[in-house]
């Protein structure tokens, strides 16, 4: 642990004089003199000083500043106030204190929350991380003024604690009475307060070691530094590392809480910008012009070269990396430009490998899994601070990936409650929190790339895609594209895949030694707030194409060149900036194809539809066409871009491949076989029933409440074979007579109403013909003849309303 040296007055004045000489650089370059004048003109009170400049001018003082921060910063701030007073005395009286912020190269003191140990206490350190929690901004009293009405005196009191630079904190007791127990009144207008906020930063997920929880550290922000950051921001904090004693009751425990008292907060870029040189820009322009016809195909072919096949999926992922155009309309509505993709398929079809490639290629990507993520873990959570008890807002994965990509593996393993939480993020690009007295809105403008397995583990070809997917339509419509990746048995394709995988295992990177373990995602860390080698990186040459390797690229033709990963990142970064506009021709084509997709969706029910065709599909077509135009570095979305977008949507929505047609034929053959078997079984049962009826006794009646026999027996009850030929002739004569009688519709309706009354009065399901005739013609002006009754009953029999058997009418 670095020992803290308490400066006496002589050393403090000497340090103050050294810092004043450093700021007064009029005879040198006048950098800080100009900065102080700008500070006065901008009405600011914090000066940003580079440690590199101080190290060049006074190396001894710079080392003392880094190792003994509290006393040195107090001297530095006093020197700044004296220097401001020498330039503008009236401005120096406006503020009680002026503050110093540091930047530059900190060397070994440029750390992460994991490497921030006790040896850095009382030192100036620079910590990188992601903001995960932010407390509310609260006023903190610095000086209170109290008035005593009895004595007519005014009492002033200053407050300092361990979060200030003063070496000895004062008592925190707020005075209410003077020495003579006279009550005091607080003069709030004369009291001085400062803003106070506490944030928590967590180490970068890409720098955290695998298998270990990410570390975090609390940062205290005061005055002008508050509200500079929000959850999800990647920042560099320069400040003093200090320990605070942990109190339990009236005693101080042996464990200490450490905080970082910030003096400068620098926001790192949302998009990690690669270093561009003039040569890189020239190569990007040349590549887009020379390959203007097939630039999209070339980039998609070079995407994830270690994965064989999946051409349409690679094109879609390239569109996801490029993105559409985000629009904020005048009426306040938001149209997202991010593209969301869902990959569903059998195991071992490289879904997770495609996700991993996006993690390495996208400028900002956050990986999560379905089982290891909750709804609030993906969006945002409101937590309670253990010490103060106040509410805090904690950012989730989608908020941390703002302006980036969220890769969710095992998407089907999430619960429905957790999946519902991301609905707003996927469409509106923001997270709205309204709970525990906190109403906040966080930006989460990120693309979602999810991978999932079908409901049955493997894709069942005899079920519809919607049954295999098993996700609700409200979620599927938010995905722009949904790809079904099948593991099909094709000897030729299997041979190509096996050859490709074996070549990947035989490849060894240049300079790799035998038995060396390769570090995952290792890179050189820059131990400064600014990249000192930025100009040197600019001069490095970026190759457009990869050097041909027989193991990596196989025995392909020399014409099929692979774009290098470094050039791909730079090209995508430049292409994302372009905002192409729709032409009239492409807009008309997209509208026509959208209406055709809707009609195709409603007309052909046997088509293998993967997701619903809604109004969001129209926006999907526009986003995909815009991304294709970005790949061409075009300022307009032309007809060829719209055609490519429609082709992608047709492939993803309807799966128009030959295998699907074979499956439909096979399914139809199976259905015809089933129908033949059913017909045979029906014939067999009818023959059995005929045999039973021939052996039945004479006069045996049909029981309408016996459902043991099938419905096919019912029409045979009309003409039982046990009846003699005389009854058959009578029945035939009756039917002939009924056919001769002409019935009018009012007459038929009257008969139906009278028949219903007869059944209701009898409270039975069957009535004899004689009783029926008497009941219908009772008290009727125009009675029904027997021919009319037979005609009405035959009409109702044809409509399956009644059944007549052996002089008994049954109500169906």
Curated annotation (Swiss-Prot):
Modified residues (N-acetylalanine): 2
Molecular function per GO: ATP binding; ATP hydrolysis activity; DNA binding; helicase activity
Catalysed reaction, written as an equation: ATP + H2O = ADP + phosphate + H(+)
PROSITE patterns: MCM_1 (PS00847), MCM_2 (PS50051)
Major location (coarse): nucleus
Positions of the MCM domain: 295-502
Modified residues (N6-acetyllysine): 293, 547
Stretch list, region Disordered: 664-744
Annotated signal sequence range: none
Biased composition (Basic and acidic residues): 720-744
Locations listed in the record: Nucleus; Chromosome
Residues bound to ADP: 353, 393-395, 397
Pfam families given in the database record: MCM, MCM_lid, MCM_N, MCM_OB, WH_MCM3_C
Function: Acts as a component of the MCM2-7 complex (MCM complex) which is the replicative helicase essential for 'once per cell cycle' DNA replication initiation and elongation in eukaryotic cells. Core component of CDC45-MCM-GINS (CMG) helicase, the molecular machine that unwinds template DNA during replication, and around which the replisome is built.
Similarity field: Belongs to the MCM family.
PANTHER family in the record: DNA REPLICATION LICENSING FACTOR MCM FAMILY MEMBER, DNA REPLICATION LICENSING FACTOR MCM3
Protein name: DNA replication licensing factor MCM3
Species the sequence originates in: Mus musculus
Name of the coding gene: Mcm3
